[in-house]
Amino acid sequence: MPTYKAVIAYDGSVFSGFALQKDKRLKSVLGTLKEGFARVGIKSDIIGAGRTDKGVHATGQVICFQSAHFLDSQVQAIESLRFLLNAKLYPHIMVRSLHIVDDTFHPRFDALWRSYRFLLSPTQPSPFAAPYVSYEKIGDETLFKNALQAFQGQHNFVFFKKNGSYTKNCIRTIFAIKHYTYKGLDIVYVRGNGFLRAQVRLMVGAALAYSRAELSFHSLQEQINGQKQHYTYPISPNGLYLCEVGYR
């Protein structure tokens, strides 16, 4: 039975996160995928590259599943399957690409890096844009950029994870992080080998606090070094997007 790798996009504002929720009344990305796939006869397990939190979007989440219904590896047959899946997942989830991969492929454990973009609006967005950007004003832009660069490299991010979330190893490596502007928005791009729960929201929030003189650079460094927690507020997830997962 062939294994499929799919790159998907979804609107996180309508979901309570990627993972299945204990409260069955809450809508999850994975639950919606399972329902949509079942409607075309696919009842395989679906494995994701990561679990995005409530309100976090994705333009490049990676999942894998198996299906015996479409054994033909020809491009036309795979595109037909993608079309069928998108018809069932519309309007909040889209399968952007679909390929047959080796049966040993695992979207989470085989991933070398993941990247996120955070869209920040310095002005209050309209009700139509509000679910897709975070309303945050940068103080001093130079200070903000300096704070972001302090995260680059390998650190113990024990104080950059959501309270109550357990992780055995909090060591993570940030390969790249930068700030730029596009069409009136401040955008933070970050790429790392993995992220703790709410880590990106806490990182950007701490950098914003430093740019506004609400947090000293010494305190920021103490927190990055895993010595002491000073900043504790994860900013709104509205503008956060999982944009790519990298493999060999």
Swiss-Prot record:
One biological process term in Gene Ontology: tRNA pseudouridine synthesis
Signal peptide (from-to): none
Record's protein name: tRNA pseudouridine synthase A
Similarity comment: family membership: Belongs to the tRNA pseudouridine synthase TruA family.
Oligomeric and partner information: Homodimer.
Catalytic reaction list: uridine(38/39/40) in tRNA = pseudouridine(38/39/40) in tRNA
Chain's role: Formation of pseudouridine at positions 38, 39 and 40 in the anticodon stem and loop of transfer RNAs.
UniProt KW keywords: Isomerase, tRNA processing
Top-level taxon in the UniProt lineage: Bacteria
Catalytic residues (UniProt): 53 (nucleophile)
Listed CDD domains: PseudoU_synth_EcTruA (cd02570)
Binding-site positions, substrate: 116
EC top class named in words: isomerase
EC number(s) on file: 5.4.99.12
GO MF annotation: an example: tRNA pseudouridine(38-40) synthase activity
InterPro entries associated with the record: PsdUridine_synth_cat_dom_sf, PsdUridine_synth_TruA, PsdUridine_synth_TruA_a/b_dom, PsdUridine_synth_TruA_C, TruA/RsuA/RluB/E/F_N
